[in-house]
Amino acid sequence: MRTFGRDAADDRRAAVRRSDPFRPYVSYDVILYGALRKKGFLQESRAYLIPGSFAVAGLNFTPMYNFSRFFRAGLSLDAQYDESANLKDHIANDYPLADELKFHRPPFKEQFAVGVSIRCEVVMPIFSINLGIGKNLIGRGDDTNSFYQVFALKADVARNVFLHVGYQLYKFRNPNNLMLGVGYRFNGR
């Protein structure tokens, strides 16, 4: 096909660029996220919804091996602070009514967790779908010492900057928290 202003040399250079072979490489994603959440728990066969909202903040560092233009996988170091974690173990009043729940603030070590997860990612031109499964290695209490699963969508906003929207489950069935954040990809190509 011929167009105005192009010659055969331009066509040959374009053909060479299209046929460049993909070379696998490692990229590094750093993600900072946060969200608000509600919390409920069961005690003596009765369900309680804790009044108010609680903050969740996290940081992920994920080296990813890029197997092809469309798939990458790696391990992620995941740190998360959850203000509502393990509250059921720190009830201040005896046999409270649902609107009168009072709590002692749990120690930081019961609300903070660090884990490692295996991640895989399907890469598309504008966004990527990220799936992961992991285990908290540092964390005390039922809410922070568990297996967790991550499903996230990464939408590119610049060459190496992306928005991160995800959800985390724990113990393969229980909803944990929303993950709204921003990320940066080092060594992205």
Question: At which residue positions do the language-model features occur?
Answer:
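Outer-membrane beta-barrel "beta-signal"
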Residues: 1-10, 175-189
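Residues that define the transmembrane beta-barrel architecture of outer-membrane proteins
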Residues: 24-26, 53-59, 110-114, 145-149, ...
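Membrane-embedded beta-strand positions of outer-membrane beta-barrel proteins
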Residues: 28-32, 75-77, 116-120, 131, ...
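Transmembrane beta-strands of outer-membrane beta-barrel pores
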Residues: 32-38, 79-83, 124-126, 133-139, ...
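Surface-exposed strand-loop-strand hairpins of Gram-negative outer-membrane beta-barrel proteins
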Residues: 35-60
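Flexible, solvent-exposed loop segments that connect beta-strands
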Residues: 41-50, 84-108
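Transmembrane beta-barrel domains of outer membrane proteins
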Residues: 62-64, 119-123, 154-156, 183-185
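Repeated loop/turn-to-beta-strand initiation elements of outer-membrane beta-barrel proteins
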Residues: 70-73, 124-130, 155-165, 188-189
